[in-house]
Amino acid sequence: MALNPLKLDKNRAYLKQIDQQAYQHGWHRLTHRQRRAEVTLGNRGTYVGLACAAVAAVLVGMLAFNPLGIGAPRASEAESPASTAPSTHSTAATTTSANDVATSAGKGTAAYGAPAVWASEDPRTAQIVANMTTQQKVDQLFIVSPEAIVGTSSTVTAAGSTTENALALDPVGGIIYSSANLEEASQIKSMLSNSQTYSNEAVGLPLFLAVNEEGGSVSTVGGHVEGIANVGDAASLTSANDAKNTYQSVGNYLLGLGFNLDLAPVADVSTSSASSPRTFGSDPNQVASLVSAAVEGLNASGILCSPKHFPGIGGVSVDAEGKAMTSNATLAEMESSTLPPFQAAMAQGVPFVMVGHLSTPAVSSGNGSTPASFNSAIVTDLLRNQLGYQGLIITDALNTDAITSSYSNNQVGVLALQAGCDVILCPEDFDDAKMGVIEAVRSGKISEDRLNQSVIRVVNTKLTMNNKLTQAGFTTAAGKVRQ
């Protein structure tokens, strides 16, 4: 009998029971991989086959039984909904503040105003989060490629039963698409619409459907999809009005296709007159003005955006292998050069800020070689506490050489959350990264409260997005929220 999508809820409950048993025998990672392999067979899979594979994994796990219980979860950590509803207050991550991040970091805020609140607290959030399992919470913190979701090395250009079943087991927070996934407008609309439907069926929440649409050399959609023109490089925009109109146009065509998140604009400041075409120039004040206008345009269109790459990679040096990036700027130098564009963007109101992988030794003594995306001195002390940003903090893509050359797959999500990030973008191996976070929560390395803080921000942002885009008529981009 073919796998019936109507039985997915029963399947998930059964697999969670199997997961608990497998975890107790120290074989959780194999169970996770086997259950995904079975479910992603789509229409070829059978419910009986699904159960047999899971039971077989438990039997194998029993052979590797660990009598000392090393790595086994406590009974109170079983994969079940939380017993009480968490607070919906978007409190900052609890970390040890770096002494060298001076309180003067907030001085520049006055020039641009305090960060505007983009996502309002929604009364539904607490109950939604309380009803999630630990795995569902962790899944919501990942934005990954469509290939990572279904576990294939082949390019994905459609969303059918395989995607549906994969999202039922791993209801990720979002999907990011490359130009290889996008063939033409009707294909994109169908793929994104189907994915939103499957996400709602799985967890009752919409997906963040993301692209890197900066314009010019980094345009996933513009210039690639028939009928949509490339808007040109950021460096070609010299007036605030041009920047606003251009990025409002970008937001409009992305929303029309079904996307709801543009990982743009670039808020970095070039360090020479020969500006990178991805930036708005080398003058911090001009860049701040144009970034602010770009955010205003994206906000006017209704699409979510994410200025990047905090605290600014315009003046970094790169090691001999072309991997690790380092900024030797002091905090005072950042205040006058790289931070103003981000402050200007936050004053407009942005749902996301992306943190780069540069190290900042002059700002974070003791862990100066740590990438900013894993560094609480940058993420929590500077961005969250000193600059006052309370929206979602997303890592830059974690499948880059700067990360994969120094960190294992099961570390990256844990380190990002410990630093204060909320959303984990494109780890090299989604399964390993996700299981690393789940294990960290089970062991207490990441507290349930810390996990809930990020999940609450994600859910609040999705509910706000759904309200705004539904009212504007962008139904695919908005997705649905289970009532």
Question: Where does each model-flagged region fall?
Answer:
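Active-site-proximal loop/short-helix segments
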Residues: 221-225, 260, 264-278, 282, ...
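Glycine-rich, aromatic-flanked loop segments that form ligand/cofactor-binding clefts
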Residues: 195-226, 246-266, 287-312
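Second-shell residues forming the walls of enzyme active-site clefts
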Residues: 133, 154, 186-197, 286-450, ...
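Short acidic, glycine-rich surface-loop motifs adjacent to enzyme active sites
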Residues: 108, 164-185, 263, 268-272, ...
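Second-shell loop/turn segments in exported
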Residues: 110-116, 125-128, 148-154, 174-184, ...
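Preference for extracellular/luminal or secreted protein segments
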Residues: 2-168, 405-483
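Hydrophobic faces of well-ordered beta-strands that scaffold small-molecule active sites
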Residues: 139-146, 173-177, 207-213, 261-264, ...
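Solvent-exposed loop/turn segments at secondary-structure junctions
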Residues: 146-151, 180-184, 213-218, 261, ...
